[in-house]
Amino acid sequence: MTPRAEPALTHDGDVLTALAGAEDRFTLSRLESLIPHRSREGLRQALRRLVDEGIVDRQVAGTTHTYSLNRQHLAAPSIIELASLQTRFVERLRETLQGWSPQPIFAAVFGSSARGTMTPTSDIDLILIHPDSDTSAWEADVDALALSAQRWTGRPMNILVMAREEVRDARHEEPVLQDIARDGLPVLGTMSSFVRLIGGRR
């Protein structure tokens, strides 16, 4: 049988992505916490299918069942490669943004793509913080980046551009800034510097 290796599109793909991310054994409860947008029963059925196909190993100790990726399976290298797509995407974003003038003082992916809870209809959210008050110099770059990101991922990208002072002024009025501080995936700059910018502590 051909194993199902589509990341983040099916229960099977989500399970494989989680298992490929660490050489560890996972209980159903742990997988459920890592994949909160999937039902427990759906994850249970996916594990049963993947064990039957041989791509996932099941270990039983008393009443506890744990699961791990069968890394000797011929499909395992491809699954691991798919699981690393987020890291590669962030690296490509960073390389692109480092070529801008001026560079963002902070950039981060946020929303479902940062939390690992994307669905087939999700888009990708990115915040870019400009060092100056006038962000117009970035307009062409932002449009080009949105197009490139969709080519890289097949997903539309929503880009939130804010000036440094605008972030400071809006920190108490924009809940999205707190969401980014909590769940964001930094591309340029550090999360601690962003938290300080919005008046938090880290």
How would you label these PLM feature ranges?
Residues 1-103, 115-121, 131-202:
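Catalytic core of pol beta-like nucleotidyltransferases
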Residues 106-114:
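Short helix-loop-helix/strand-helix junction enriched in hydrophobic and basic residues
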Residues 126-129:
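Short beta-strand->loop micro-motif that forms the acidic, two-metal-ion catalytic signature
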